[in-house]
Amino acid sequence: MSRIWKRTVRLVCLAGLASVLAAIATTVSAEDKPGDIRGTTLDPTADNLAATWRKANLVLPASLTDRERWQGIPSAAPEVTGKAPLVVLLHGSSGVAPAVKDFQIWLADTMGLASVAPDSLAIEGRLTYVSPVSVEIYERIHTLRLAELTHALEASKAWAWVDRSRIVIAGTSEGSVAASRYAGPESAARLIYSWSCEANYFVERPRLGFGPEEPVFNAISARDPYFSPSNPWNRDYAVTGNCAGALKGNPHAVVLVVDAEVHTILNRPDVREATSHFLSSVLKP
C-alpha cells in the first residue's frame, strides 16, 4: 500500500467526524435548467486575461501590511516589504464567490498566507453554464482558465515581495482542472478541491501537469454531486471520484475524501485542518 493510500484512509476517518458546513458551488436560479448557456466569450485574449487580473481578489495577511489584513484589487494594494509565499487560487464556475473569499481570509488570518484569485467572470460576455453541457465547451473553459493562471503567475512577478520558490497553485471545482493541468515551473505545491483528476463528463482527458513527486493536496466529497460515481453523467467512465489514482506513488501527496454529498468543501473545518497541516509541511522557510 503506497503512502498516498495510507494517508487517504486516515483522513477519511477524520472527515467522518465533522459536520457538513458547505453548499453546492453553483447556485442555479429558478429560471436556469441543465444545459443552459449564457454569454459567448471564452477567448483567452490579452484584454480578457487582463480583466481577470484587474478584478482579482487579493488578500494580504497582517504580517505583510504591518497593520491589519488587507483585501481588494491588486492595483490598490498597500506596499509590502520582505518575501512571502503566494497562493494563486482559481475559483469555480460561480466566480469569486463568498466561499472563495472566506477561504482567502482563512489563509491570511490562520496561515499568514497571501492569496490572489483572478476573476474569470470579469470578462465581458463571459460564457456561463448549467451542467451538463458539451465537452467541447468545457474544454474551451479549461483552456481559458489555464491561460488565466499563467497570466496571474506572470503578472504577480511585479510584486517583489513574492517568494517565487513558494508559490502554491490552488483551485476549486472548475478552477481545479486548470490548477491540476498547469505544467510550468512555478509550483511549490497544489491544492485541488472538488475535482477528481480523472476522465469524466467534464474533460476530454485529465492532462495532469504536476510532477510525480510534487506536493499535491486533494479534497473532495465521497458523494460529490458532479465527479463521483453517483452522478449519472459519469456512467460511461470508470470514475473513483478522487485524485488517489492519479497521485498513487507520490510520496508528497495527500488525498482527503470527505464523508459528504456537497460540492464546495474548502471551508469545512476538517478540510481546513488537513490543508493547514499540508501547507505547513511544504512551505517551511
Please place each PLM-identified region on the residue numbering.
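An N-terminal hydrophobic leader/cap segment in hydrolases
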Residues: 2, 20, 24-76
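Alpha/beta-hydrolase active-site loop signature
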Residues: 94, 121-124, 197, 224, ...
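Primarily recognizes the serine-hydrolase "nucleophile elbow" in alpha/beta-hydrolase
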Residues: 154-210
